[in-house]
Amino acid sequence: MFSRLTGVSLRQGLTVQKRLFSYARPLFNSSGSERTGSGSRQYNDGARAGAEYGYTGTRIVPKLSTFYSANPHHEAHIDNLEALLRKYIKYPTVQVEERPSWLSLQEYALIGGGSRLKSTQYKQLLFMLNRLNSIDPQLVTDEISNTLAKYHKKTKLQPQRDTLKQLDEFGRSLAIGRRKTSTAKVYVVRGEGKILVNDRQLNDYFVKMKDRESVMYPLKAIDSVGKYNVFAMVSGGGITGQADALMHAIGKALVAFNPLLKTRLHRSGVLTRDYRHVERKKPGKRKARKMPTWVKR
């Protein structure tokens, strides 16, 4: 059947196949000798045999064993951590209360593949770092410590600045408060409770009772009404905005007299600026949110 289809006998086909396999043999054997038909020429080493026939180049070995992966640098880090984890997998672990600050995604990208790094790969790194960090501190070796130290966030130790407000040579505390487009600059000093706003009495400048109560609210929060003199300069915005800006400034100025009052003033809300603004009008609407009446026909 084979001879009918190909015109070649089975014995002839096997002979040709053997010849093809013999041609496909390597030029040099493992001992460095040349294969030449019935005999072979002997060489002391394979390099000499290759040099005679022009085979002088050698294959370049990649520096990383993960060279052919999608992200070689990240995979190299993961391989090192996995090897370390397998080595100390039987070590007991403890519940870590405070985890160290590891490198952020952007910082790790500098050594972990750059734009090739994915968020899932970064989460994989954090999982392995936290697992190694959970080993009992009494059993942690230098190898583990040195490896984890490579992934700690580098923080520059800066001297802590004194953020407490200080009184000037006249015993005054200066502060600036803002609300919308209004700004208030106040000087607070211990006294009999006198309050001047732009060289005018409080009742003359703020006609509305609500605005006057807003100005006095920081003093009421610490039970100090009538114990401090306030000299304020306000500008910009409307009357209510100026009153809220003045309240913000007085609250900040009172902290300089007694830092322990900061918690109470903060809970009262006078130390936090109110960033709310009037929402702008939108096209096609009557106001910011109000829509015109819909008519079917």
From Swiss-Prot:
GO terms (BP aspect): translation
Gene Ontology cellular component terms for the protein in this record: mitochondrial small ribosomal subunit
Intracellular or extracellular location(s): Mitochondrion
Pfam families (UniProt xref): Ribosomal_S9
Keywords: Mitochondrion, Ribonucleoprotein, Ribosomal protein, Transit peptide
PANTHER family in alphabetical order: RIBOSOMAL PROTEIN S9, SMALL RIBOSOMAL SUBUNIT PROTEIN US9M
Membership in a protein family: Belongs to the universal ribosomal protein uS9 family.
Name the record gives this protein: Small ribosomal subunit protein uS9m
